[in-house]
Amino acid sequence: MAKELVMYSRTSGCPYVTISKKVLDEYNIPYREIYIDRDGEARERLLDWVGFLSVPTLVVAEAGELIPYEEPEPLERGLSPRGIDRGSMLTEPNASQLKQWLSHHAFITVEGV
């Protein structure tokens, strides 16, 4: 299965989106960016998955798809999704969390991860 990275984002500025884009650009990782403030279906998907409109939410999808290739691990009700590795999904990560998640999914190789 060919994997693709999809980032759910919004058009207005967000520090976590900036961090994620910086890491993805640093490693030359291609990704598709879906803007939840322009796409109502994407907005609803994000609410279903995360419980919040938290961006960025990154998913590993099959090539050409917009949804995770496998069901993300569930979140405890009311728990913030920030930085929690849910397998095929990661929301609002810091740079270190994102690098570890990307390494786990073989998008990059990071020493010590």
PLM features per residue range, with description:
Residues 62-112:
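Non-catalytic, surface beta->alpha helical segment in thiol-disulfide oxidoreductase systems
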Residues 8, 34, 46, 86:
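Conserved short-loop catalytic and cofactor-binding motifs
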Residues 36-54, 59-65, 100-105:
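Thioredoxin-like thiol-disulfide oxidoreductase module
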Residues 11, 37, 93:
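Conserved residues at beta->alpha junctions
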Residues 1-32:
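Local sequence-structure signature of Cys/Sec-based thiol-disulfide redox active-site neighborhoods
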Residues 5-7, 58, 98:
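Hydrophobic beta-strand residues in large extracellular and virion-surface proteins
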